[in-house]
Swiss-Prot record:
This is Neurensin-2. InterPro entries: Neurensin. It comes from the Eukaryota. The keyword Metal-binding does not apply. Keywords: Membrane, Transmembrane, Transmembrane helix. It comes from Mus musculus (Mouse).
Amino acid sequence: MSCSRPCVCSHGTSVEESTWYGFDFYPNLFYNDWLGTTTLPYNPERIPIRYINRPWPSLCWKVTVAVASLFLLLGVAALTTGYAVPPKLELVNESKFSSMEDPVADYNQALMTCRVVGATLCGVAGIMLAVCLFLIASGWMFQDIKAEPLVTETDSPVEVFRDEPEKLSPAFHETSSQSPFLTPPSPFGQQSVQTSQPQRDL
């Protein structure tokens, strides 16, 4: 029995369309993941399918990663400022004690504050990233995945089942012709019913 549809391997190059179905580009995968959708490039029916995840878990981990990255950058900047800038030495002088002590002490206190704030921000970012990785590993981020046909740009409905003429094998035709439930053909062939009237002799 011949196949009416062209057979295309899932890993390789299609002869008709010259399309590679074995991989996808990383920017395309990142774009689909950011939108919360994943487009399957190949399926046996040649219908593009879009897998939609739940919006809240996807949005939750994206916002968490973004905020954690921002906190991490700010923490690293604060730590770099606190440890890279050298502190000033406090000058002990009785005549200028009241005028020189406050600026130097404030400067050193600001450097110490930068170190503390930087360490706190880095710790919070690490905790947020750890929680996000734990939720991803536990599978909470990837639940309730739904599949639906991908509608083209022309808003035309996707043809799932195409009407094709049924092609049966000769053996099936012979079996169906020899079925006992079928009416046997008449030995006299097709008979036409004719109504005739006797002709009167004039």
